[in-house]
Amino acid sequence: MVVEGVLNPGAFQFEGKTWLVLRIAERPAQGAERVSFPVLNASDQVQIMEFKWDDPDLDLSDPRYVRYKDMTYLSTMSHLRLMCSEDGIHFHEPEDRPSIIHGKGNLETFGIEDCRVTCMEEDYYLTFTEVSRNGVGVGLMHTRDWIRLEHEGMIFPPHNKDCALFPERINGKYYSLHRPSGVDLGGNFIWISESNDLKYWGRHQCIMHTRPDKWDSARIGAGGSPIRTEEGWLEIYHGADHNHRYCLGAVLFDLEDPSRVIARSDDPIMEPEMDYEKNGFFGNVVFTNGHVVHGDKLTLYYGASDELVCAATFSMDAILDTLKKTYCRPD
């Protein structure tokens, strides 16, 4: 298998170090006559599927997918890999903990992706995307020591992804942001839900829409866990336009009622500018689902062009100052 991308890491602090849960996207080396891609079979073993490049029923117009007749597959299969760092820049595999998390079962036959990590009540909760021919949903795992992971299964069924947990209970309830995908009606909007136990979710509300003619006109989705500030819950989210250009923005939710949007970025706080952000496996993409906070310093770990992992630092106060210029509501 060939690694096509290392991208979209979850991030957290543990035992005095910065840790990332990387997404590793792989596929077989491509031959001259056939396109090939991996899936998991019923025994959780990797099986290689192939189609001839010149097959008229084959659609490879989007490098992320292999479409054949009435079926859609992923061109790569992803697993998760744990890395740690003493300085937040230079990362290595941990020596005393398992570092690889593979997909398994019939809900993860196309892999697992884009993990978000939330530390809450001494435990670490991992929400991640489960992909299979059954659709795209959200899975949940948790751990306290990063040695044993407890799998809770799928908590949001297809089609859903981009699930970020709030890092504490609010009025006795757990809250999560997530992104159901509208097919014919609705759209790729951000929703909020609440739960008593993190496994079963209800009181679903749509709280953020895409905005016509803006940088986030086609789809939006949550980044890492919301960050508590004096002004409200600060969330860094991604938005894309109809040309599939992904940027990052900020939104502020009410501390006591996180379904209420206080403010939202008019303009991106980050957009593809560097060559490695504009060109790659799937270019013009900056995408975050993990960060760490030290005082006013916010370090975003993000995927560039679905191929690389990068880091960028921001002032929390500076982001909040830009939001003070706006007042918004779901539109």
What is each PLM-predicted segment?
Residues 1-110, 118-218, 227-281, 295-298, ...:
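Beta-rich carbohydrate-recognition and catalytic domains
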Residues 276-278, 286-290:
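Short glycine-rich, acidic/polar surface loops and turns
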Residues 113, 163, 224, 287-289:
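Structural signature of WD-repeat beta-propeller blades
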